[in-house]
């Protein structure tokens, strides 16, 4: 097992998580005793204990006082915070993970975009006004796109959407910089922003779902043209 890590704790965490992912520690199984596991990995028991607590908080493990540590089915117990880890564990499946991520974000964003234009159209107008000073670079578009989503999610009347977006942030930022490296993708997005601005100024929230659906289809087609050339390094949170 080849693991790149920045220190003992990082190595131990990646070792255990990869072992769970590769079914060496399958769901429902009991982890080796602390002393045995620390010797196996090559870290101190104190370091291992800290790592186990962190993995339990992320849903990988179940720790109960006086009982052995049990491996969870992370698909049932973890949250969006493990997206980065899954991308790192499964680079071959990363394009599919991104497809699923973008599909989920498109579906959810249609709800909070509509909510923002309904309940806080002035906020939507303010953030959309920034498109007129937007630099035509991948970095600027990726940053603005996240700002737009974050602002409208917070203004939608349900701030829980912001927490969902926060779970996507690191991964989406890297994918976004790659996606917006395409001039066609930037133009497509800019036209979408302009149409959304027109709706926001008119306080027309009823037409938002149709606009989002059209943009979702068109940006999805654009993504399919770009995904096969996506660098594998994007999966890594360096």
From Swiss-Prot:
Residues within the DNA-binding region(s): 34-53
Protein name (Swiss-Prot/TrEMBL): Fatty acid metabolism regulator protein
Lineage: Bacteria, Pseudomonadati, Pseudomonadota, Gammaproteobacteria, Alteromonadales
Gene Ontology biological process terms from the UniProt entry: fatty acid metabolic process; regulation of fatty acid metabolic process
Compartmental location: Cytoplasm
Quaternary structure note: Homodimer.
Molecular function in Gene Ontology: DNA binding; DNA-binding transcription factor activity; fatty-acyl-CoA binding
UniProt gene name: fadR
This protein's UniProt keywords: Activator, Cytoplasm, DNA-binding, Fatty acid metabolism, Lipid metabolism, Repressor, Transcription, Transcription regulation
SUPFAM superfamilies listed in its UniProt record: GntR ligand-binding domain-like, Winged helix' DNA-binding domain
Entries under NCBIfam families matching the protein: fadR_gamma (TIGR02812), PRK04984.1 (NF003444)
Role played: Multifunctional regulator of fatty acid metabolism.
PANTHER family, per the entry: FATTY ACID METABOLISM REGULATOR PROTEIN (PTHR43537:SF52), TRANSCRIPTIONAL REGULATOR, GNTR FAMILY (PTHR43537)
Domain HTH gntR-type, chain residue ranges per copy: 6-74
A cellular-component GO term for this protein: cytoplasm
